[in-house]
């Protein structure tokens, strides 16, 4: 724990000593590309696709959204269309529909251009398998013997969220937890999300006795204690996602910020083709849901 506070102090000192002068780097400009953020899952709901145009790094204007596109997914037999949302420019939504696990889906996007041509984009993603159920969720401070996870920060207890479930034997499956508190989505951006590759623990009962014996627990989220109240409802949507999504996620996170020289060593990966016309990702997932009610185990009776 000492190393945790030492790192905090060092970061603070570096912040005080850092230069505040703006440095503007002259970057080569290119033609706008089409940004695609589309998802499809086994949940019975309206699935979304968001289409926009890229802009220069220093652009301060509103992002230009794509209008009038034709968007659909198909498994080769059935086709599901995303219809343009007239109240949200650039958003396209399906009718309520559920995808099927272990099924390959192809996303197709046709974007009309001002000269009458059409830009045709496509992507494929296998909607992966998922666990059958989450047996329970426990919210508690981390109690491992090592310092890999803090239990206290800024004089407040950290409450970690631990799901208990039988994981799939496939080590390439990645789990992404989506967290709600009292029906309010908390992980609504990628920077607030976690990706959990279980790796060598694939096939284990997650957070069960075998993992405890190895002093290994896997939390999926945390709360500062002051942000939790007795009887708060905490819901976990555990998404199983394709393994190639993890490279997109990490390069995207590395590329955030205001300095073009501090980021990923190459362009953010995309599974949208042709790659010289588009950026972004077509994201498939299967989802299993569980909910718990927070009880303060240290509350005085």
Language-model features: locations:
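N-terminal hydrophobic targeting signals that begin at the initiator methionine
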Residues: 1-2, 20
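A sequence/structural signal for flexible, mid-protein segments enriched
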Residues: 20-301
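C-terminal motif of bacterial Sec signal peptides marking the signal peptidase cleavage site
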Residues: 15-18
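Sec-dependent signal peptide recognition
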Residues: 3-10
């Amino acid at each position: 724990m000492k190393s945790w506070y030492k790192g905090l102090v060092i970061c603070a000192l570096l912040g005080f000593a850092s230069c505040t002068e703006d440095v503007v780097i002259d970057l080569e400009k290119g033609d706008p590309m089409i940004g695609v953020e589309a998802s499809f899952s086994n949940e019975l709901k309206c699935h979304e696709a968001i289409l926009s145009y890229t802009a220069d790094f220093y652009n301060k204007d509103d992002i230009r959204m794509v209008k009038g596109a034709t968007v659909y997914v198909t498994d080769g037999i059935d086709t599901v269309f995303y219809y343009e949302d007239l109240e949200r420019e650039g958003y396209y939504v399906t009718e309520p529909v559920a995808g099927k696990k272990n099924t390959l889906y192809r996303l197709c996007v046709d974007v009309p251009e001002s000269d009458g041509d059409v830009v045709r984009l496509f992507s494929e993603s296998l909607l992966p398998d998922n666990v059958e159920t989450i047996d329970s969720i426990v919210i508690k401070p981390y109690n491992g013997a090592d310092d890999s996870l803090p239990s206290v920060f800024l004089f407040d207890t950290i409450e970690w969220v631990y799901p208990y479930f039988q994981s799939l034997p496939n080590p390439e499956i990645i789990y992404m937890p989506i967290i709600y508190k009292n029906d309010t989505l908390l992980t609504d951006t990628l920077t607030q999300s976690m990706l959990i590759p279980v790796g060598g623990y694939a096939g284990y009962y997650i957070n069960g006795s075998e993992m405890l014996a190895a002093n290994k627990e896997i939390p999926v989220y945390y709360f500062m204690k002051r942000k939790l109240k007795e009887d708060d409802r905490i819901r976990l949507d555990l998404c199983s996602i394709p393994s190639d999504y993890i490279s997109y996620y990490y390069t995207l996170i590395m590329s955030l910020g205001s300095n073009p020289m501090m980021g990923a060593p190459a362009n953010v990966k995309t599974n949208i083709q042709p790659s010289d016309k588009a950026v972004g990702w077509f994201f498939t997932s299967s989802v299993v849901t569980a909910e718990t009610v927070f009880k303060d185990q240290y509350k005085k009776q």
